[in-house]
Amino acid sequence: MRKIILASGSPRRKELLELASVPFEIIVSEVEETIGAYSSPSDIVMSLALQKASAVAEYNSDHIVLGADTIVTYESRILGKPSNEAEAKEMLQLLSGKTHEVYTGVAIIAKDKTVTFYERTEVTFWELTEEEIDAYIASKEPLDKAGSYGIQGKGSIFVQHIQGDYYSVVGLPISRLVRELKQFNIDVTHA
C-alpha cells in the first residue's frame, strides 16, 4: 500500500492530519522556496506547495506526497513569515482593524497523478493596541507564522470575523484535502 508523506515540518499541519485520522509519515522538504512571476496569490501558494511536494516525491515515487504553503495578503502585499520582531510588529499594525486574505495551497503527487488546489479565507482583525501587539510579539508565537499570527493560538484573540475555512488559516484545509485524497483511492472517512 502506498504511504502518504507530508513534505512539511509544520507542527500545525501534522496535528490537522492526525485530527482527521489520515495515516502519514513526515519527510521535510528542503527545497528553497522561490516565487516567480505569478499573477495571483493562489498561483503562488499552489506553486510553492508543488515545489515542496515535488522535492520529496522525487525520492519517494511509489508513495503519495503532500505539500502545502500558506501566505497572508493585504491589498496585494504578500505577508510571509516575519524575519524579525520589528517586521512582525509592522505586519500586525498593518492588519489591525482590517480584513486580509489567507491563501493555502496544497499539492498531492502520486506516480500517476498530481492535484493542486487552494483555499482562500478572509480574516478581519479587531483594532489592536500597541501594548497588545508588543505583548503578543514577546510571546514569540508570531515569529514563525505567515502574517505574524497564529489563529489557533494566542493570535486568536485578534480575530473579529472569519469567512472561509478556519483550518486553511491554520495551514491545511483538511476537509478539502480529505475529499481530494479520494481521487487517490484514500478514504479516511470510514477509519
Curated annotation (Swiss-Prot):
Cofactor: a divalent metal cation
EC number: 3.6.1.9
Primary localization: cytoplasm
Disulfide pairings: none
Matches recorded under Gene3D superfamilies: 3.90.950.10
Alphabetical list of InterPro entries matching this protein: ITPase-like_fam, Maf-like
Protein family: Belongs to the Maf family. YhdE subfamily.
Protein known as: dTTP/UTP pyrophosphatase
Species assigned in the record: Bacillus cereus (strain AH187)
Taxonomy of the source species: Bacteria, Bacillati, Bacillota, Bacilli, Bacillales
Gene: maf
